[in-house]
Amino acid sequence: MAASAKRKQEEKHLKMLRDMTGLPHNRKCFDCDQRGPTYVNMTVGSFVCTSCSGSLRGLNPPHRVKSISMTTFTQQEIEFLQKHGNEVCKQIWLGLFDDRSSAIPDFRDPQKVKEFLQEKYEKKRWYVPPEQAKVVASVHASISGSSASSTSSTPEVKPLKSLLGDSAPALHLNKGTPSQSPVVGRSQAQQQEKKQFDLLSDLGSDIFAAPAPQSTATANFANFAHFNSHAAQNSANADFANFDAFGQSSGSSNFGGFPTASHSSFQPQTTGGSAGSVNANFAHFDNFPKSSSADFGTFNTSQSHQTASAVSKVSANKAGLQTTDKYAALANLDNIFSAGQGGDQGSGFGTTGKAPVGSVVSVPSQSSASSDKYAALAELDSVFSSAATSSNAYTSTSNASSNVFGTVPVGASAQTQPASSSVPAPFGATPSTNPFVAAAGPSVASSTNPFQTNARGATAATFGTASMSMPAGFGTPAPYSLPTSFSGSFQQPAFPAQAAFPQQTAFSQQPNGAGFAAFGQTKPVVTPFGQVGAAGVSSNPFMTGAPTGQFPTGSSSTNPFL
């Protein structure tokens, strides 16, 4: 029965201790202000934490510390704790402590904590006796309360007259009476502030000036109907991307037919009749001369007259032009090629005509304004129309040659006939001014020409080159006429005994003597039994053994394309 009563008494004391621990000033450690004290300092009657309880045991004299949850308390101890506590201990042991003058140590450093506790309990630096503790506490409370009220309360507002006296002059802050109400003034201030940010209308104006009327630029802002309504426009931008102004330049007045401002864009401009237009047949290849294999010897005198008239029209048109077109030479070439040239009697390509040369010579343009970078092309016109002395195979008369391929006379040599001093070389084997024919000198080599009966000819003659065993030219008469595929003249062979294999003609010679209508292939040479063929004689007309001298090699041409 006594044990149960004692147990009930201990439970009652523990409950009272827990209630004291729940008080506001006992919720923190008295020495370090840590929350949740777990020990009780029975020497002074304060609630402390676990770390501070160990430090208090190391003081001299040591403090008696008890755990709140693991020990039992007597009735006297509970009453002592009720009379004391952290609030009363603060008034006694920290009665003279000033927070402004005394520094609170860092409680994370154990050495500083120990020094602070020694100053507090052993030296009693801030100790106040219990009988005076309440008085000192009340005084500190009054001092702290008055200072707090003086700093927190606003001083009483006194009139200025009481400070300056009755003799102080009256102070007028605003002499003028406001003409507008404050509401109106505030609205104007807002309008002026809004006007400062209106950067599009009044960017450079005075921000305090009266609002100016809205300018036309602001009125038409983002109005695309007035986009091109400016009074004055730049003349350079007026014709921007206007290709009508392209035709105003004098340099492009001929090529492509760019019109002037009065013409519609990109329409060919006419400089006269349709036949006299410079660019009428430009790049029109239907008027180009046909292949020479199809129209051998078909040129006539009327075509040369037509060519002369066309060239004269070209010269007449070019005389009226003030500037030189850089493509005028090509246009003249087209007119020259479109009209065929020929002679009375054609001998191969060396056709001679009796057309007047004066009109052809007058082709070069007059008063060219600037140097043309295609001057070489411009000279082709004069090259094609220049006169060359040629010997006709039938008439032996010297005429002004208007041949397109520029036949030049061939000088007499030891291989040619003494009677024919100048032989028209059909393919231009001698140096020529024709840009389409390159000159090639005869090379001395063993000939394997299928049209040659003598294998020991002196020269491997090229086309149109007279030799001892090669026809001197197409349609050229000779005293020794042998049956060949080209019906040409053969010179007296140096070795008549070896000319045992005559060649058969595929087609007979044309009676009019105007060339050859078709090329015939020679038949294979039949070698009789028991005889050895001559060296170098080939029966295949396409398999020649000596490639030298078969085609023109050297060139003295002025053609820029070769």
UniProtKB/Swiss-Prot annotation:
PROSITE patterns: ARFGAP. Interacts with EPS15R and EPS15. Interacts with FCHO1. The modification Phosphothreonine is found at T177. This is Arf-GAP domain and FG repeat-containing protein 1. Disulfide bonds: none annotated. It is found in: Nucleus; Cytoplasmic vesicle. Its main location: nucleus. InterPro entries: Arf-GAP_FG-repeat_protein (IPR052248), ARFGAP/RecO (IPR037278), ArfGAP_dom (IPR001164), ArfGAP_dom_sf (IPR038508). Residues 11-135 form the Arf-GAP domain. Coiled coil: none annotated. SMART domains: ArfGap (SM00105). It comes from Bos taurus. Contains FG repeats. Required for vesicle docking or fusion during acrosome biogenesis. May play a role in RNA trafficking or localization. The lineage of its organism: Eukaryota, Metazoa, Chordata, Craniata, Vertebrata. Residues 176-191 have a biased composition (Polar residues). Residues 168-194 are annotated as: Disordered. GO terms for biological process: acrosome assembly; intermediate filament organization; spermatid nucleus differentiation. The modification Phosphoserine is found at S167, S181, S362. GO terms for molecular function: DNA binding; GTPase activator activity; zinc ion binding. Glycans are attached at S367. O-glycosylated. It holds the Pfam family ArfGap. A zinc finger (C4-type) spans 29-52. GO terms for cellular component: cytoplasm; cytoplasmic vesicle; nucleus. Keywords: Cytoplasmic vesicle, Developmental protein, Differentiation, DNA-binding, Glycoprotein, Metal-binding, Nucleus, Phosphoprotein, Repeat, Spermatogenesis, Transport, Zinc, Zinc-finger.
